[in-house]
């Protein structure tokens, strides 16, 4: 985020090898491109969400950050490797968790809909449907937040960035 906000790549460059080791570790332990390593949506209000889904989305996010950093630092081989890995992770998530007929991820919790939407996992042709499902879920829940730590960051952003800022404000 420091690089994105200030354009200063020093911290990202200093951490590059550590990020790479971390992504490689998760990759070694995720042969099907899906991970359940992590806490999941810790401390949810009431509804539990798939730990594998949320962990895999963050595995995708971390891999994507690494790929973009590799490009920034002129590490072409790493850029190609981690870009391909990120796409494989995204494809595996959507294959296992996205019901293309309904536009629902996993069980359809606020977290399970907002996390893939906010982090760019949802296929372009499905964004509107997934966002509408998220909005409907929030309304069905009385405009109350029903997420844990991971969903908390994603929920309002996913709504706001997909045409439901008024609902996010409520």
PLM features: residue spans?
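Active-site core of glycosidic bond-cleaving carbohydrate-active enzymes
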Residues: 1-170
